Amino acid sequence: MHKVQLIIKLLLQLGIIIVITYIGTEIQKIFHLPLAGSIVGLFLFYLLLQFKIVPLTWVEDGANFLLKTMVFFFIPSVVGIMDVASEITLNYILFFAVIIIGTCIVALSSGYIAEKMSVKHKQRKGIDAYE
């Protein structure tokens, strides 16, 4: 495929993911659920994939792109906290340790789950999962 076609394919797949997340946000608003809209969207996305309403091939490259660039999504929250550092009256070392540990736990658990799902998917397709 040409680079332009790959970029368009990636953008369309990211668009599907964004639309599903947006629908989850709207569901959360309509039903006043006690969960974040993005979490509702993630659960909706999971159900759509499990019941094969949305085939994995429609979003696989876009999801892999997001997984590869996931670390960049954690940077704004850390920078945002640094902007309000003067308002934080806690012990700074403890506060930043909790932030760093929490970020690492989220990143590691997300990566672990994604890896397990990838291995399971490859095994279903009959591909050597640990190539």
Swiss-Prot record:
Keywords: Cell membrane, Cytolysis, Membrane, Transmembrane, Transmembrane helix
Subcellular localization: Cell membrane
GO process annotations (BP): cytolysis; killing of cells of another organism; programmed cell death
UniProt cross-references to InterPro entries, sorted A to Z: Holin-like_CidA, LrgA/CidA
Annotated transmembrane regions: 4-24, 30-50, 65-85, 88-108
Major localization listed first in the record, in broad terms: membrane
Membrane-topology descriptor: Multi-pass membrane protein
One GO location term (cellular component): plasma membrane
Coiled-coil zones: none
PANTHER family hit by this protein: HOLIN-LIKE PROTEIN CIDA (PTHR33931:SF2), HOLIN-LIKE PROTEIN CIDA-RELATED (PTHR33931)
Role this protein plays: Increases the activity of extracellular murein hydrolases possibly by mediating their export via hole formation. Inhibited by the antiholin-like proteins LrgAB. In an unstressed cell, the LrgAB products probably inhibit the function of the CidAB proteins. When a cell is stressed by the addition of antibiotics or by other factors in the environment, the CidAB proteins possibly oligomerize within the bacterial cell membrane, creating lesions that disrupt the proton motive force, which in turn results in loss of cell viability.
Family: Belongs to the CidA/LrgA family. CidA subfamily.
Protein name per its UniProtKB record: Holin-like protein CidA
